[in-house]
């Protein structure tokens, strides 16, 4: 940390295990010959004496044995190699890196599959050489769908302490990456705190800081100011950067008849520059030099969709797909320079138009990982856009999108707070997991099966612990049945003891076992007994109260 940082009051963050779980690690051999790799996971302890292990993004913040010192930052990962090129270059050379071995264990996949997907450009490992604090992860359609959480201050509200807290909070609930979209004061300092304390890759949009350097006037931006800003962020350790190099002058005119015009902040900045200067943007004309800078640090391109649709009316229009074609051309240039690249996508798209976006991206961009903001499936629900967008996110992820950028309830309304961040992450973890199930991703259904078994066996504490949000699941249950005996009761407050379908089913199975029958035979025998009982009472539907 810099001297300026050390003088800042240290933020407070949430630490400690998630209820019902503990932090655990596996030792994995390092293919580089360095120290063994310590791969983290979350272990859920079940009342049966068994356990269930989960992919974990929370870093040391859920490890009670870890010493958390935000001013000092997280301890660096040992054995980071800076002089052998990018993950893409090494994968193409046939090398399985330490990061690939780490990821293979986390994903439950062969390390060779990880290498091949990276070599083909279908997956990226965002891991700047200068960000050794991260736990390596992968973004690609062959792997689990990932979720990004946006944080960052604005000129109106928030502070460094709040953004650090949001970063730790988001990763606690499953954010796989973080984007710092700060546009207010202390952009460099805020980013430094986040980077030194983030266990997940950190992305940025460099044009925001470059704009601050010219006091918010897009027409004053230059290639030199932007380039120096990128290098500054590369030196700090940013893992991936959004670059709106596909916003061309001729495409800007295509947005004139849109309902919502250009809604991307970066896209609007570059559109303003192009119109003011009557030429193509410096991001486009200097893209090859930018590729060399990114490759030097192994920073991953996130080629931004500056012309994404901001309303259902504008979905899949000429401007959007024209930019996508240019992003495809740029992605090929980036890979020639050895830089990793993923493609950003929309936006606001009705459900019947979503799959077309994935198919076109895969065709034009050689299956580079697709990273989408939602998309929102409808425009009518401000304050609930974490839901409208999670619907679209599940559909687009099933079709092949590799990473989903979350949307919070505050989308279109204001800067998200801590609660909004959690709500957004949970909504998107649901969408990502639903897509993994639909795609047949290995291990995805194991968690569903474990929770369903616990539910059928009325192991309430296990249900809570296996859920995406254990504290909230427990809170909802305890609102009506708070007593401890209710944690083993064979009913909840929805149906009560008489109408619980699972209890009735369990009773049928007990009856079958007692009489040496299978379940169908038990049902038939039970129906026969009830029929006889009905006949004994004179075939009367209603009996006198005395009986």
From Swiss-Prot:
Tree of life domain: Bacteria
Swiss-Prot/TrEMBL catalytic activity: 5-amino-1-(5-phospho-beta-D-ribosyl)imidazole + S-adenosyl-L-methionine = 4-amino-2-methyl-5-(phosphooxymethyl)pyrimidine + CO + 5'-deoxyadenosine + formate + L-methionine + 3 H(+)
Gene Ontology CC: one annotated term: cytosol
Cofactor: [4Fe-4S] cluster
Residues noted as binding substrate in the record, renumbered to the chain: 150, 179, 208, 244, 264-266, 305-308, 344, 371
GO molecular function, one term: zinc ion binding
One BP term from GO: thiamine biosynthetic process
Pathway this chain belongs to: Cofactor biosynthesis; thiamine diphosphate biosynthesis
Binding site for [4Fe-4S] cluster: 492, 495, 500
Note on cofactor: Binds 1 [4Fe-4S] cluster per subunit. The cluster is coordinated with 3 cysteines and an exchangeable S-adenosyl-L-methionine.
Biased composition (Polar residues): 1-15
Keywords of this entry: 4Fe-4S, Iron, Iron-sulfur, Lyase, Metal-binding, S-adenosyl-L-methionine, Thiamine biosynthesis, Zinc
Enzyme Commission no: 4.1.99.17
Region (Disordered): 1-36
Gene3D superfamilies: 6.10.250.620, Radical SAM ThiC family, central domain
Residues reported to bind Zn(2+): 348, 412
Cross-referenced Pfam families: ThiC-associated, ThiC_Rad_SAM
Functional note: Catalyzes the synthesis of the hydroxymethylpyrimidine phosphate (HMP-P) moiety of thiamine from aminoimidazole ribotide (AIR) in a radical S-adenosyl-L-methionine (SAM)-dependent reaction.
The family this protein is said to belong to: Belongs to the ThiC family.
This protein's name: Phosphomethylpyrimidine synthase
Organism: Mycobacterium leprae (strain TN)
Lineage: Bacteria, Bacillati, Actinomycetota, Actinomycetes, Mycobacteriales
